[in-house]
Amino acid sequence: MSDLYRFGISLDRELIEAFDRHIKGQGYQSRSEALRDLIRNELLRKTTAEGGLVAGAIVMTYDHHKRELVNRLIDIQHDFHDLIISTQHVHLDHENCLEVIAVKGNAPDIEKLSSALKVLVGVKHLDLSLSSAD
């Protein structure tokens, strides 16, 4: 027996036409694929809001010449060592670095780590991307 379930939904014509344009622009091959992603994203939002277990990445660029910035970044990462799985450091040019921090833990704790890093002077950009950990 298949693990796939089929069901029907009723939508206003304007809504389904807008949805079809959207998913075509995103490159989806079918409404089913797009709907699965929407459902997964909504469930992830719920998990995140409830403080559930998530995994993800913090991606940031920063100026490593800023006084004490590198030391503060390392200190903060050690403060949150239980959330950090690994880090990757890339030298973009003479002044700028890219750091990718793989994380796993409760969403609010990961968001605290992300916020602590984002507000440091010299951090040019930071993006947090979360996904389900199960």
Swiss-Prot record:
Record keywords, A-Z: DNA-binding, Metal-binding, Nickel, Transcription, Transcription regulation
Lineage: Bacteria, Pseudomonadati, Chlorobiota, Chlorobiia, Chlorobiales
Pfam family, one: NikR_C
GO biological process, one term: response to nickel cation
A GO term for molecular function: DNA-binding transcription factor activity
Protein name: Putative nickel-responsive regulator
Source organism of this protein record: Chlorobaculum parvum (strain DSM 263 / NCIMB 8327)
Residues holding Ni(2+): 78, 89, 91, 97
InterPro entries in the record: Acetolactate_synth/TF_NikR_C, ACT-like_dom_sf, Arc_rbn_hlx_hlx, CopG, CopG/NikR_regulator, Ni_resp_reg_NikR, Ribbon_hlx_hlx, TF_NikR_Ni-bd_C
Keyword Transcription listed: yes
Protein origin, superkingdom: Bacteria
Cofactor(s) in the UniProt record: Ni(2+)
Family: Belongs to the transcriptional regulatory CopG/NikR family.
